A protein has these predicted regions:
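Membrane-embedded alpha-helical bundles of multi-pass transporters/translocases
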Residues: 1-249
Length: 249
């Protein structure tokens, strides 16, 4: 079927999203004399209940993951069917902008409050995607601009939440005098995989249900434009709310 023909490209994008954090320089966390807690679920539940920063960060990161997952999974379909060109060059521009923007975003995170910088780029990503729904065949330069700006915002989504999380880990371990880093990173990894799985499992069947299913000769483009151009904006709105509620450590 048509969707299976692009599975290799989708796997490539998914792999890049999951492997990118490996390329980001790890932030050192102090290692005081801490006690290891035996109960994983109890520790995580207790952290969610007592640390509002951790809860807000996880919720914001989940919605950001869903938004980025949908745009990444539908990227090739959108470029081929709406813009009408090969997606390779736009993929290079998109991910290239993300990587090139990392040093700039890292510097901004050091100079200003990381939470405020992240919220700014979440809002910028929403503004950048507003024209996407209205793009049509041949709008290559307009979509190239979207790729550059949204790729830059993707860099912020990759580096700033991880940096904020490192601060939360350090603060929580000092407050509770127990080892929490492994548990928190496990939750973080689960959120990454869950958001990507939900994006793939929901958006592709949804656009097929509403009329875009090339394997059955259905080429209604409105569902594809809505899913790629509008849904990521909607999903980022709760992320703005939760990220705005993060308090500076």
């Amino acid at each position: 079927a048509y969707f299976s023909d692009i599975s290799s490209e989708i796997y490539l994008i998914a792999s890049l999203l999951l492997l990118t954090p490996i390329l980001i320089k790890k932030i050192p966390i102090p290692k005081p004399n801490l006690k290891e807690s035996n109960s994983f679920l109890l520790s995580v539940r207790n952290l969610f209940e007592t640390d509002k920063n951790f809860k807000n960060l996880c919720l914001a990161y989940l919605f950001i993951g869903l938004s980025n997952g949908i745009t990444s999974i539908l990227f090739i379909l959108f470029v081929e069917n709406i813009i009408g060109v090969s997606p390779l060059n736009f993929l290079i521009i998109y991910f290239g902008s993300a990587f090139l923007g990392l040093p700039i975003i890292y510097s901004l995170g050091l100079k200003f409050d990381k939470q405020k910088v992240w919220v700014f780029f979440i809002i910028l990503a929403c503004i950048t995607f507003i024209p996407v729904y209205f793009l049509s065949n041949g709008d290559t330069y307009q979509f190239m601009t979207v790729c550059i700006l949204s790729g830059f915002c993707l860099g912020a989504d990759l580096i700033l939440p991880a940096s904020i999380q490192a601060n939360i880990v350090s603060n929580a371990q000092e407050t509770k005098n127990s080892v929490l880093s492994g548990k928190i990173y496990s939750v973080w990894s689960l959120i990454q995989k869950l958001s990507l799985a939900l994006s793939a499992g929901i958006c592709l069947p949804a656009i097929g249900y509403f009329g875009f299913n090339p394997s059955e000769g259905q080429y209604l483009l409105t569902p594809l434009s809505f899913a790629y151009g509008i849904m990521p904006i909607i999903l980022r709105l709760p992320a703005i709310f939760f990220a705005s509620n993060l308090k500076k450590n």
